[in-house]
Amino acid sequence: MHDEQIKKNIQALIDDFKTNYQEYKKDSEASIETKLIEPLFFLLGWTKNDFDKQSKAQRGEKLGHADYAFYIGDKVVFFVEVKKVGIPLEREADKQVISYALSKRVSFAVSTNFEELKIFCVEQENALRNKFRVFNSPDEYLSNFDDLLFLSKESFEQGLTLKKAESEGRLKRRVSIDRRLLEDLMHMRSLIASDIEKSYPGKYQINEKDEIIQRIIDRLIFIRRCEDTGINLENLTLGEVQELPEDKAYLKLKEIFKRYNDVYNSGLFAIAKDNDCDKITINGAIIKKLAHYLYESKDGEYIYNFDWIDADVLGQVYEQYLGKLLAQTRSGKAKLTNGQAHRKEQGIYYTPTYIVDYIVKNTVGELVKNKKVKVKDIKILDPACGSGSFLIKAFDYLYNNLSSGKESKQYRIDGQGQYSIKTEILKNNIYGVDLDQKAVEITKLNLLLKAAEKNRRLPEEIDVHIKHGNSLIDDDTIAGLNAFK
């Protein structure tokens, strides 16, 4: 279809919209998508085979996934968020689709209700304010037709949209969402450390303080992940903590911790004998800040949704997080210093995702594919598990196989009459060891995040299966406390 015919058809769509505007205002988002948004993109060269559509009922309004993902081949090139006609495109909705695109490493995002349409190059610094293109009314689809064509299939196939963004200096890459999360986690770590030192001066050594801080942050991330995947406990969210007065914030947080321990029965929330995180009190103002930073970045540019952030990305964030060592200044303030040299001295290195994928595909993947052994009998050990990237990928392979295979029937039902493949995989298949105690705790967290299901107890075996020590040496005269027994 040539440009003049496209313009003619778009004009017909605009005329219909204007004529039936009051009726369109009554329509649901799903109806607007079918009657207006999809026809517009069809005129721009896209077909039904080029996009995935996810209904509000499927995804849950609060999870906030984009309405459409548009593909060139098997690669997503932009996301689209649709709102009802007559409802202004608000900043929060725009921020949401930008954050979603960033979390999925996609360069473009679109927000529209047909009355307005905004295109964002999400790699640009301040993308929310510096929009790639804006159409303030349907008439501008024609008056700015060349700009509208940047959303055409041909433009993405030929790389024209990306080239235009580059020529305008929009690809001076902004801080990625995982990098921002890392910075916010480190800021949170410093806030808690300074508050502990202020309230309990000299009571804790640096390593003891770090263990307390990590346990608290791990719990907060677990809770946020449960919220964003829709399996959180009713009326127990960090958002509620944010809304409370400072003098009640920490009490509410402790209540949430207790309820999560009661329901999930995981060591993550249990009162630990060797960790004082449940014995100390943290300033309410600090608690409210911690909660806020796990919903939205400190600079206000990102919305964090832990359902969007893949486990391997979270693992990478934690690997870098562990590379920073907590230190204390003479004034008593906490600061973070680069600890990469220390980690390398201990032989602690991060394994890139593509290598993890290759190893798992050619080991676990081959066993599962060729059915050389029953899945329930496979034992997988990572003797230097780090943050658990290999074990997480192995978990995914086993789970995907069991979910669709006959062998799943061989997994037993638990004591409550409930059946969980995820729990059984952690009980039967997954093992890990690492020299770094912090890495061990993060591996446990990442696996628990994988296994968590609404109101299902988590396996206690994870504390036995994921261990701290030197997997090569069992002689304590050589390895000391790190000797693996």
Positions of predicted regions on the chain:
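Short, basic/polar, glycine-containing "phosphate-handling" surface segments that engage DNA
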Residues: 1-21, 61-62, 72-76, 82-226, ...
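Acidic-basic catalytic patches of nuclease active cores, encompassing PD-(D/E)XK
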Residues: 18-53
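SAM-dependent methyltransferase catalytic region
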Residues: 26, 32, 54-61, 304-305, ...
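Metal-dependent nuclease catalytic cores in nucleic-acid-processing enzymes
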Residues: 37-40, 95-110, 415-416, 445-453
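Active-site metal-binding core of divalent-cation-utilizing nuclease and nuclease-like domains
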Residues: 44-74
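Short helix-capping/linker segments at secondary-structure and domain boundaries
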Residues: 44-49, 226-238, 325-328
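Short, flexible loop/turn elements at secondary-structure junctions
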Residues: 70-72, 83-86, 313, 319-322, ...
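Extended, well-ordered alpha-helical scaffold/bundle regions in very large, multi-domain proteins
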Residues: 224-225, 229-271, 381, 387
